[in-house]
Amino acid sequence: MAGSAVDSANHLTYFFGNITREEAEDYLVQGGMTDGLYLLRQSRNYLGGFALSVAHNRKAHHYTIERELNGTYAISGGRAHASPADLCHYHSQEPDGLICLLKKPFNRPPGVQPKTGPFEDLKENLIREYVKQTWNLQGQALEQAIISQKPQLEKLIATTAHEKMPWFHGNISRDESEQTVLIGSKTNGKFLIRARDNSGSYALCLLHEGKVLHYRIDRDKTGKLSIPEGKKFDTLWQLVEHYSYKPDGLLRVLTVPCQKIGAQMGHPGSPNAHPVTWSPGGIISRIKSYSFPKPGHKKPAPPQGSRPESTVSFNPYEPTGGPWGPDRGLQREALPMDTEVYESPYADPEEIRPKEVYLDRSLLTLEDNELGSGNFGTVKKGYYQMKKVVKTVAVKILKNEANDPALKDELLAEANVMQQLDNPYIVRMIGICEAESWMLVMEMAELGPLNKYLQQNRHIKDKNIIELVHQVSMGMKYLEESNFVHRDLAARNVLLVTQHYAKISDFGLSKALRADENYYKAQTHGKWPVKWYAPECINYYKFSSKSDVWSFGVLMWEAFSYGQKPYRGMKGSEVTAMLEKGERMGCPAGCPREMYDLMNLCWTYDVENRPGFTAVELRLRNYYYDVVN
């Protein structure tokens, strides 16, 4: 999305941010307009795109750089590049469609920072409000949702933010739009946008010399929006921004957003009851002073005597009150927050957690088919009747015939760990049942283990895998902060709720550390998954969050290998010898270099120099934001 792509260019001295074409030309004039002088700016048409402005024969030439679906950048019909900087470097050696070679970058003057676009100023608040309203999340659940799904939320907000803008009137008729525009002031350039039909087209209604003009806004096959024969835009707010600077095919520029009738009539409680205007020439220069209004608070009225044509008292990018559109869920793919396992079932204050987490067996129904089995027994799908809802659950059932007290102790130890954990990226325990067998009742993750899912779905793209391993790193960061060591982190113990939602499971080997401890020391060597273990675990029986980081590196290797077994064909002792020699597993085929570099960082031999999950999660997050957008 725009924000992350722009962030990746901010370090370039010749990147000017969200400036207009005219501003770019002024800068090139300042630089002497010599052939090959160039600068880079943010695209005002395409989300995540850029524009290249080049001087040649005393004229400025402009090229749109679009971000492709695979995350590369290209001028239309040209070669794809990993970044805008790479594209500029290439065209300094090959014109390849440009009017001339790029010879000299025009750098920002001292003290000048890249100009911020209107969406960057508002998106954080819009995202937060959208997540709060849509999923009723608060606190850590809200923060986790924003971090893990930020690219998707940015895209969602960018393409639907118009629903919250005062100039968007939704599904009203042509006649209604004319009546609305003609109410109140008759300022030239007063406008509104309405939805025309279900095909995604709109209409711009513009007041000029007392008449209402109608311009159709069509959506092409690629989703771009434009008036007939006009420039194409990714979003309505970009279109409005553009035509507030220049008419460019309209009879005049957009000047005054036409408010909804309730606000125009000055109804009590309407957020913008005062008639207002803003001067022509665009929105970006004025949006810097924007502050997101607190719920229930009006923005202060302009001081008396101020000149309405030159002083802005109405921000066209200020969201109006009210909920987001009801059809939004139909326009996007499901996010983790849409599932019933994103929040704990006990997050609802009306759902009372049973004392000592023991559940009533009569409220639990089990299916006959097994989801899986192991030394402990079996796992079955079930349904648990809570106070308000019936919850789909996974039930780990202890073998009855063995009557082994050690197995029971292990199950209860796992339950003891799980009852203390509450995070969207960790399988939560609902409770335990003592009936025909001991049962551990947990959240259900329908798609099963990550390794098996990837083995069967090799079409899954890298960015989807990065999304999932990032979620695992978020869950592990939570464990680290909560002073728990997992000790069995592997792809087989990551369960998928959906193709885009992973949860860490299987806490049978997990240990809680005391506040004064940073590692757990086992007394004896058990049935350990040695191929996932750090050297200090094997050599000294020491386990910490840093040893979980080593295991996470192996999990990443499994994920990018589409579920292959690590160190295939090797015995545990051979793996240990290999690690002692400083050797590591090779890069999986097709795995991004940045991800393999992170694996090797996780496999740092010296535990003191190995990063913790705070650093690992942040590095993954930044890379994930970059490739997904």
Curated annotation (Swiss-Prot):
Where is ATP annotated to bind? 371-379, 396
Pfam family of this protein, just one? SH2
**Cellular component, GO annotation:** B cell receptor complex; cytoplasm; cytosol; early phagosome; nucleus; protein-containing complex; T cell receptor complex
One GO MF term on file is:
Toll-like receptor binding
Phenotype when inactivated?
Embryos display severe systemic hemorrhage and mice are not viable dying perinatally. While T-cells development is not affected, the development of B-cells is impaired most probably at the pro-B to pre-B transition and mice lack mature B-cells.
The EC number on file is: 2.7.10.2
- Show the SUPFAM superfamilies listed in the entry: Protein kinase-like (PK-like), SH2 domain
Q: Where is the SH2 domain?
A: 14-106, 167-258
Per the Swiss-Prot or TrEMBL record, the active site comprises: 488 (proton acceptor)
Compartments (UniProt record): Cell membrane; Cytoplasm, Cytosol; Cytoplasmic vesicle, Phagosome
Which coarse location class applies to the principal site listed for this UniProt protein? membrane
Please write the reaction equations for the catalytic activity of this protein.
Answer: L-tyrosyl-[protein] + ATP = O-phospho-L-tyrosyl-[protein] + ADP + H(+)
Alphabetically ordered keywords of this record: Adaptive immunity, Angiogenesis, ATP-binding, Cell membrane, Cytoplasm, Cytoplasmic vesicle, Immunity, Innate immunity, Kinase, Membrane, Nucleotide-binding, Phosphoprotein, Repeat, SH2 domain, Transferase, Tyrosine-protein kinase, Ubl conjugation
Q: Where is this region: Interdomain B?
A: 259-364
On this chain, the residues bearing Phosphoserine are 43, 201, 270, 289, 291, 310, 313, 344, 373, 573
Q: Which residues carry this modification: Phosphothreonine?
A: 255, 311, 339, 378, 524, 576
Matching entries from SMART domains are given as: SH2, TyrKc
Q: What is the effect of changing residue 194 to A?
A: Loss of interaction with FCER1G and TYROBP
Activity: how regulated:
Autoinhibited. Intramolecular binding of the interdomains A and B (also called linker region) to parts of the catalytic domain keep the catalytic center in an inactive conformation. The phosphorylation of the interdomains or the binding of the SH2 domains with dually phosphorylated ITAM domains on transmembrane proteins disrupt those intramolecular interactions allowing the kinase domain to adopt an active conformation.
Q: Where is this region: Interdomain A?
A: 107-166
Post-translational modification, as annotated: Autophosphorylated. Phosphorylated on tyrosine residues by LYN following receptors engagement. Phosphorylation on Tyr-317 creates a binding site for CBL, an adapter protein that serves as a negative regulator of BCR-stimulated calcium ion signaling. Phosphorylation at Tyr-342 creates a binding site for VAV1. Phosphorylation on Tyr-342 and Tyr-346 enhances the phosphorylation and activation of phospholipase C-gamma and the early phase of calcium ion mobilization via a phosphoinositide 3-kinase-independent pathway. Phosphorylated on tyrosine residues in response to IL15.
Q: According to the UniProt entry, where is the signal peptide?
A: none
GO BP annotations, alphabetical order: adaptive immune response; amyloid-beta clearance; angiogenesis; apoptotic signaling pathway; B cell differentiation; B cell receptor signaling pathway; beta selection; blood vessel morphogenesis
What does the record say about domains?
The SH2 domains mediate the interaction of SYK with the phosphorylated ITAM domains of transmembrane proteins. Some proteins like CLEC1B have a partial ITAM domain (also called hemITAM) containing a single YxxL motif. The interaction with SYK requires CLEC1B homodimerization.
Q: How does it assemble?
A: Interacts with LYN; phosphorylates SYK. Interacts with RHOH (phosphorylated); regulates mast cells activation. Interacts with NFAM1 (phosphorylated); probably involved in BCR signaling. Interacts with VAV1 (via SH2 domain); phosphorylates VAV1 upon BCR activation. Interacts with GAB2 (phosphorylated); probably involved in IgE Fc receptor signaling. Interacts (via its SH2 domains) with CD79A (via its phosphorylated ITAM domain); the interaction stimulates SYK autophosphorylation and activation.
- Mind telling me what this protein is named? Tyrosine-protein kinase SYK
Q: Which organism is it from?
A: Mus musculus
The primary gene name is: Syk
